[in-house]
Amino acid sequence: MINTVALFWALFIVCVVNMLRYYSSLRALLVVLRGCDPLLYQYVDGGGFFTSHGQPGKQLRLVRYIYERRYCDHHDGEFIRRCERLRRQFILTSALCGLVVVALIALMLWH
C-alpha cells in the first residue's frame, strides 16, 4: 500500500520543480523580449520584474498578454514559441498547485 504522506510530499516536490521551471522560463522570455521588443519590455517592467520594487500592475500586463494569446501577432518566432511554452507551464503549474492544496486538505481530513 502507498503511504499517503509520502505521496503528498512527492506531489509537492513535483509542484515545486515545475514552479522553478516556470520561473526560469519567465526569465528567459524576458531576456528574449528585451532583444526583440524593447517597448514591450519596458511596458511590462522587464528590468524590475524580479526585484523587490517591481510593479505588480505591470507584471500582470505580461500575464494578461500571455493568457490572452496576444503574442500570436508578434514578429519574432522565438518569442512566440517561448510564450506558448510559458503559457503551458503556467497551466500545468496552476493545476499542480491546485492538486497539492486538494491533497493537503484530504490529508488533513483523513489523518
Curated annotation (Swiss-Prot):
Membrane topology annotation: Multi-pass membrane protein
Domain of life: Bacteria
Compartments where located: Cell inner membrane
Main location: membrane
Family annotation (InterPro entries): Universal_stress_protein_B
GO cellular component, one term: plasma membrane
Transmembrane segments: 1-21, 90-110
UniProt keyword terms in alphabetical order: Cell inner membrane, Cell membrane, Membrane, Transmembrane, Transmembrane helix
Family (UniProt): Belongs to the universal stress protein B family.
Protein name: Universal stress protein B
